[in-house]
Design a protein with these regions (language model features):
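C-terminal accessory/tail domains of diverse enzymes
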Residues: 1-80, 86-89, 117, 128-348
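Long, hydrophobic, well-ordered secondary-structure blocks that form the structural core
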Residues: 78-126, 130
Length: 348
């Protein structure tokens, strides 16, 4: 497993969230990771390969914190204060692309086609899980993923289950480019913090393991219902209505079915408690978009004319705390959002 994460910079003066490229010195890159430039948004981080979700969470934090340039002697860029993992802000989108393979040599096309069938009708759930762009062009909107709603026709083209092509901008595609081994690529998720990316990897790894074992596809829906769920997930996030075998379900009930169906695969992963907390929070109506929304809503009340600057300042501190090893709860608290206790929330 691996990810490509696109993101914004937080620049001075004014803690402005911008497209400015953040470029760490290449000598601090570890083998297998790249600091690169995306044509659309600018800054992109290409991770090394992960084999476990615990490894993914640790290495994502370790890799992404290298973009705190002010901490390095030879990677400083003037006026860059921090970075922001958001799916959208002004007028550009930032996304996360997941790459899945079955070994060092990648994944053959036939196996990728089979795995894509297992994943396809869960795509709306993954959109809801990772929705993280409620702000667009300086306005707090009612939508969870403006990036997906406004950019999917160009950057995440809809596919039908059973159709897997090499077209780069399909929402799920067979990625066989350059010298890298071929992978199955999923492009639907907003740019996000490591906890949400690793949570998505939990579900993708569980589905992949079930596919390898020869288990049946867990969810098959009519294409028209898939399209409805896809749109619902981008608009409403955790409040969306999804479909499981063409039956309407809320996101919490859908999540429970996922944990029931893939219980053996998930139990065998040694999923960290902080990732289980992500799922528990999702079950009670909180994802990345909701955390950002609550923070922005509070700041609009207290600083109606300068709420974006205050959000940028809070986010700069919050993301440093998170990537330095603290939890999602600390991140949310630094943004002024108190997350509810989830000790009694059960999954599955």
């Amino acid at each position: 497993m691996g990810v490509e994460v696109e993101f914004f910079a937080i620049c001075m003066p004014g803690y402005t969230i911008t497209r400015r490229i953040v470029q760490p010195h290449e000598l601090i890159a570890e083998r297998g990771e790249r600091f690169t430039v995306d044509q659309s948004i600018g800054t992109e981080y290409d991770s090394m390969v992960f084999y476990t979700v615990r490894e993914a969470l640790f290495l994502l934090k370790s890799g992404l914190r290298k973009f705190f340039l002010k901490r390095y002697l030879y990677s400083r860029q003037a006026k860059i204060e921090s970075v922001a993992f958001l799916g959208g802000w002004k007028d550009r989108f930032a996304g996360t692309h997941f790459h899945i393979a079955f070994g060092p040599s990648g994944i053959p096309k036939k196996q990728a086609e089979k795995l894509a069938e297992h994943i396809h009708d869960h795509i709306p759930f993954l959109i809801a899980l990772c929705a993280n762009s409620p702000v667009w062009r300086g306005k707090l909107t009612k939508y969870a993923s403006n990036r997906f709603l406004l950019g999917s026709e160009e950057y995440c083209c809809v596919t039908k289950r059973g159709d897997l092509d090499r077209y780069h901008y399909d929402e799920i595609n067979y990625n066989k480019r350059g010298r890298k081994p071929p992978t199955l690529e999923l492009r639907v998720c907003d740019s996000n913090i490591p906890e949400y990316l690793a949570a998505a990897l939990v579900m993708l790894k569980a589905i992949a393991q079930a596919c390898i074992k020869g288990r049946r596809i867990s969810n098959v829906c009519r294409h028209e219902n898939y399209l409805i769920a896809r749109e619902n997930a981008a608009r409403e996030g955790v409040k969306a209505t999804l479909f499981w075998k063409d039956k309407k379900l809320s996101v919490p009930k859908y999540l429970d079915l996922l944990f029931k169906y893939y219980r053996k695969e998930i139990e065998g992963m040694d999923v960290p408690d902080e990732l289980l907390d992500v799922f528990k929070l999702l079950k009670i109506g909180i994802n990345g978009a909701e955390i950002v929304r609550r923070s922005c809503r509070s700041l609009r009340r207290s600083h109606p004319r300068g709420w974006e600057r205050h959000f940028g300042k809070k986010y700069a501190l919050a993301i440093e705390e998170l990537l330095d090893g603290h939890t999602l709860r600390v991140f949310a608290r630094e943004l002024g959002v108190r997350l509810p206790v989830t000790d009694r929330v059960k999954l599955g």
